[in-house]
């Protein structure tokens, strides 16, 4: 678990070209797993990559 890499909401928003509020909404909706560190979310890279794969599958289905 110590080897896990974590991303911020802002980093993900920038990569996906969406607003940080959109990323937070995905987290609240349970679509993107995240740790809540007293109001600041951290997303494991592994969970983010899984989220991206699910989005890709959803776009092609």
Predicted segment positions?
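Aromatic side chains
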Residues: 6, 41, 48-51
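A short, Lys/Arg-enriched interface patch at domain edges and termini
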Residues: 46-61
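Major-groove DNA-recognition helix of helix-turn-helix-type DNA-binding domains
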Residues: 16-41
